[in-house]
Amino acid sequence: MKPTFLLAALFLALSATPLFLFADDSQNWAHWRGHQGNAVSLTATPPTQWSESQNVKWKVEIPGRGSGSPVIWENQVFVVSAVPVEGSGRGELSFRLFCFDRKSGDLIWDRTAAQAKPHEGTHKTNGFASASPCTDGERVYAHFGSRGLFCYDLEGKVLWEKTDFPPMTTRAGFGEGSSPTLAGNKILVPWDHEGDSVLYALDKLSGEVIWKTDRDEPTCWATPLVIESNGKSQVVMNGQNYARAYDLETGEELWRCGGQTDRPVASAVTSSGLVFVGSGFRGSFLGAFRPDGKGDIEGTESVVWTTVDDTPDIASPMMSDGRLYFHKGKTGILTCIDAKSGKVLFGPERLPGVSSTYASPIAAGGHVYLTGRSGNITVIRDAPSLEVVSTNSLGEGVDATPAPVGKELFIRGERHLFCLSE
């Protein structure tokens, strides 16, 4: 890897930090990739070894199919699924939100948000419940794409629903999958497809549109990242044409930078005053950007470094302690770089047991968890050199990003939701 450096020292005096999406949620996992969006828990200490019979606190079967990650608030675990409806005709699905007891795995409640036959197909490795839910500790939000966004209280009472989004037409019928993001009084909903693409900011209490911003982008499966930079909240989004940032309050585009590859999926992360955005389908690109620029920042001092080596496709990069971890394309090949300089710390390295990846890496308790589609999860030290700790399996495939909370690790597999604990 040969990063291109552009006045890297200048960014050290600046700061960009994740905007804490919810009040006092560091002991929970309230959003896809956690409360800061960097896929790191600073408090969790989950197990590093398990099997189908070891360190499984409980497991529960989930009907239907979905790859949305579980989210956890105190004693409640939320997960979504698209469940075939028996006797209703071919292709009819029930779009459901499940709430489980964190201690026992018992079902607390199950709500059907919608029942419909999807208007278009999906990729064979995708489904129709790929977006992760999110919660602010008072409400939980389930997003089923073209079927709508649904808001419930924590007892399962529906508070509002928004079902008037225009139907998505995704690239090659690959299906939908971007997750919503909570930030303050807003819930952000990306709507990138082959039609008119839009980023929505909705009132989280009512579902009313606060603002929407047109995006000249084709299908993108990334999830918005909200950061604070120089006193202003920004919404950072990947895109095939440009990586972009928007003013959280108004939706105004603040800056953009080209270089991305086709049909981006990976979401942005942030650390050390920088934002990192990349993609890895039919090409390779990863860039480190200072979020203080204006307009098109390509070729300016706001681009600190870029690389075109071994960058991620489906799985998003993970940021921990100033180190950026990412897989090459959809493979299990791992690279770790110093976020400030772009210098390779180790990799690309082929990991034992992990050959293909959709789930994003996570970090907790001084370890990094790397999930293969086969269900193998390799655990390494969260350190500047590679040290494999273990490789573990639960006997079924995993495409959803795991969620570490407390002393537990929650994993949504093809058929079951698992709670792991020593």
Tell where the protein language model's regions lie, with residue ranges.
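Positively charged n-region of N-terminal signal peptides that target proteins for export
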Residues: 1-5
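Noncatalytic, solvent-exposed loop/strand surfaces
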Residues: 21-422
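Bacterial N-terminal signal peptides
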Residues: 7-18
